Amino acid sequence: MAPCMLLLLLAAALAPTQTRAGPHSLRYFHTAVSRPGLGKPRFISVGYVDDTQFVRFDSDAENPRYEPRVRWMEQVEPEYWERNTQIAKGNEQIFRVNLRTALRYYNQSAGGSHTFQRMYGCEVGSDWRLLRGYEQYAYDGCDYIALNEDLKTWTAADMAALITKHKWEQAGDAERDRAYLEGTCVEWLRRYLQLGNATLPRTDSPKAHVTRHSRPEDKVTLRCWALGFYPADITLTWQLNGEELTQDMELVETRPAGDGTFQKWASVVVPLGKEQYYTCHVYHQGLPEPLTLRWEPPPSTVSNTVIIAVLVVLGAAIVTGAVVAFVMKMRRRNTGGKGGDYALAPGSQTSDLSLPDCKVMVHDPHSLA
């Protein structure tokens, strides 16, 4: 594996609802960060349905609890939150042990700050068959161990992870993971999609434009922006006379805009005076047809000050999105997508939904020890 930065069952009376055709995914991200001299490690857990964060737990909160991040989850009965809060607190203890174990495996001192992360979940197609299951761990921003696509074997990233691999193989942990990913995870994904049906199926088409930036040696940079789109999957390409410039294009990862939508840009360096020969093409499921854009010289009445102000605002939005970059990067690596912050959806129901007792909603992490 290449190193990477990991920077409800509805009440029976509720009628079935339609959801946007797949694929759909349910993923959870756990992060523990040690901070010597400042108390216990901080533990954060977030859950995503597709590109929307819907639950969160933070051990540093005044009253650490599993909490909803979208309005449609506020319909769920209190028992659900109590049960998941206890699960999250148990996971927090396992992650603290794993941090100490990793220090020993890597022969590191306890004086520095370290991170231990986990991502797990499932992705299904439009027929609700499992496309991919995930169970991955990282230490200090690099891959540690991961369940392979066959959901039967593990890949260890280094010699320390081999110790863990042998222990988990002997314990048969992959079988338990596979049962969760193929069964429980898919079922809960279906339930969450039903709960969020009014908002999760939405598509927001991108607003796109091209900016021009001066460079030395008679060159300019053309940057194609796509803003305000959802879901996160999008493709930006530059073409010269109809030929794609894949090798010469700079492309950033899709980033959350902070309002429940996403943003992305792609740029090329072109000869001064040849800007009109280059076209940007934007492909997104929210568009009836792909967009084709060229750089348009601004009217003479537009001052440089106004242009600079616009770019400053766009830059600030990008910085805001970087706060959750590791989640988006994991998503891009595992699904081929390029993906947020998360919009609070208008709730169509105000009463609590009664959820039948379900023993497993989230999946306990493994201990390295």
UniProtKB/Swiss-Prot annotation:
It comes from the Eukaryota. Residues 329-369 are cytoplasmic. SMART domains: IGc1 (SM00407). Disulfide bonds join C122-C185, C224-C280. The modification Phosphoserine is found at S351, S354. Glycans are attached at N107, N197. Residues 204-295 are annotated as: Alpha-3. InterPro entries: Ig-like_dom, Ig-like_dom_sf, Ig-like_fold, Ig/MHC_CS, Ig_C1-set, MHC_class-I_related, MHC_I-like_Ag-recog, MHC_I-like_Ag-recog_sf. Residues 296-305 are annotated as: Connecting peptide. GO terms for biological process: antigen processing and presentation of endogenous peptide antigen via MHC class I via ER pathway, TAP-dependent; antigen processing and presentation of exogenous peptide antigen via MHC class I; defense response to bacterium; inner ear development; negative regulation of neuron projection development; positive regulation of T cell mediated cytotoxicity; T cell mediated cytotoxicity. It is found in: Membrane. Residues 22-111 are annotated as: Alpha-1. The chain crosses the membrane at residues 306-328. GO terms for molecular function: peptide antigen binding. The keyword Manganese does not apply. Residues 22-305 are extracellular. Residues 112-203 are annotated as: Alpha-2. Its main location: membrane. Residues 206-294 form the Ig-like C1-type domain. One of its GO terms (cellular component) is lumenal side of endoplasmic reticulum membrane. Heterodimer of an alpha chain and a beta chain (beta-2-microglobulin). Belongs to the MHC class I family. Involved in the presentation of foreign antigens to the immune system. This is H-2 class I histocompatibility antigen, K-K alpha chain. It comes from Mus musculus (Mouse). The gene is H2-K1.
